[in-house]
Amino acid sequence: MTTESAFINILRGFAKDPAARGLLDDAAVVEVGDSCLIITHDMMAEDVHFKSNANPADVAWKLVASNLSDLAAKGALPIGVLLGFMLGDDDWDRAFAAGLEKVLGHYGVALLGGDTVSNRGDKRALGLTALGIATNRPVPSRAGAQVGDIVYVTGTLGDALAGFELIDAGFDEVGALADAFNRPQARLTEGQKLAPFVHAMMDISDGLLIDAERMATASRLGIEIDLACIPLSPAYVSYRTDSLESRMQAASWGDDYELLFCAPAGARINVDATAVGRVIAGGGLTLCNGDAPVKLPPTLGYQHH
């Protein structure tokens, strides 16, 4: 089966409009007069992104949050969404709609339209397009990192991983860890605050390591991540302990929806973020644990295939 990266490479051959940014970014950036319209689209598929017994309201929340996270990486103000919905069981559909109304209300985002289709199979697939207006020019991209920049990440990593494992094991009451997996928070305010001074920014839905490598590739430079600096929550440490292995897992699993960004050394960071590395000459991703080099793991993060 074609991998995600291989298929995107095929599309890249004819996605030549400047707004597409070479399909190397989180979203399209369309110049409209004096403004920039930010457009992104994400999909969720049953048994890939959510299980058949998942709460439909949680599915709706995550579908919206994952799209808004891409807008956050552009420092954008959301203005609305378009839903692509595969019809099925009536109770599930109604619960999804109620959850969608709730999450859109939480973020103050309008439902502008979309499309529905009947489901001839036994698995659902859902899509959402999110629209936003850039709050800063130039609009941040993955490709602007500069040698000497400090690499930061907002929030903490690994909670979604722990939440997924606990839910998968049948635990019903796992609190914040379950919420991190089922109902991630898009860092819209943080993205808007960071947009004026970052050199590069993206969200890390697929995992810190794989997305740091993507940023390095887009910027044609290298990024070194110090695993000793990976921010972990007390709940994650209580569940998995604080070790090199647990930090590696937190950095490579994904579903965190935090912001990864590069800023000049000495810049005053105006959001809750942790310095986790630096931009270096060369290319690709390298890892260390303090002063000790660390070999890259076989899998840096999540890729569809």
Description of each model-found segment:
Residues 146-155, 183-208:
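Internal active-site segments that recognize and position negatively charged phosphoryl groups
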Residues 129-140, 147, 174-193:
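Active-site glycine-rich loop that binds ribose-phosphate moieties when present
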Residues 1-5, 9-10, 88-112, 117-126, ...:
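Glycine-/charge-enriched secondary-structure boundary and capping motifs
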